A protein has these predicted regions:
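Membrane-embedded alpha-helical bundles that constitute the cytochrome b-like, heme-associated redox core
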Residues: 1-199
Length: 199
């Protein structure tokens, strides 16, 4: 089991962070659309379900820092064959995805005036923090006024930007796998051929 990345493959840690982030991101969407489609999102009955969305969103945010740190200090697999323009576009797309993984949880948290309960601990709502107290005192803003533009940004990112960036990421991986027939997708899969679990 290779924990660190190599020139040919992502290590266990990078793959764990990638797929955990992806699972939490997708699950957060499933939960919030369940609330939108099947519940009244303004009723107290929806809050425990929304709390799951908040937990998953913050989990995505918490995972960004170790992902970025590991990307910066660790070896990155070699670029697949392609033009310099393709490599620059791929690099830009990856950083756009990281930006999204920061912006979505951040705006979600800033616009949530309720604590997020993780079970063993809870994260205080932003409206109860010292930074918001400073913002409120300095600019005379109530939390209700503060959260309106923050929520608008969060919803815009969620409805229009997130799926576009994620779809581009997935389509690019499938393009490399099925059209280019290189190892861009397989080197991030949970197991390589040599790591397949045996009976």
């Amino acid at each position: 089991m290779q924990w660190q990345n190599t020139a040919n493959r992502f290590g266990v840690l990078a793959r764990f962070l990638h797929w955990t982030s992806a699972a939490a991101f997708i699950a957060a969407y499933i939960v919030v659309y369940y609330v939108i489609w099947f519940m009244d999102d303004t009723s107290p009955e929806s809050w425990p379900v929304l709390n799951i969305h908040w937990v998953l969103g913050l989990l995505v945010g918490f995972l960004v820092l170790p992902r970025l740190l590991w990307r910066m200090i660790g070896v990155q697999p070699d670029n697949p064959p392609g033009s310099a323009l393709e490599h620059r576009l791929a690099h830009l797309a990856h950083w756009a995805l990281y930006g999204l993984l920061i912006a979505m949880p951040l705006t979600g948290y800033l616009g949530t005036g309720a604590p997020t309960d993780f079970g063993l601990f809870s994260v205080t709502g932003f409206n109860e923090t010292a930074p918001f107290a400073w913002i409120s005192h300095s600019y005379g803003l109530s939390f209700e006024a503060f959260e309106v533009p923050i929520d608008a940004i969060h919803h815009f990112l969620g409805k229009w930007i997130a799926w576009s960036v994620v779809a581009l990421h997935v389509l690019a991986a499938l393009f490399h796998h099925w059209v280019r027939r290189d190892d861009v997708l397989t080197r991030m899969l949970p197991w390589s051929k040599s790591e397949q679990p045996t009976d």
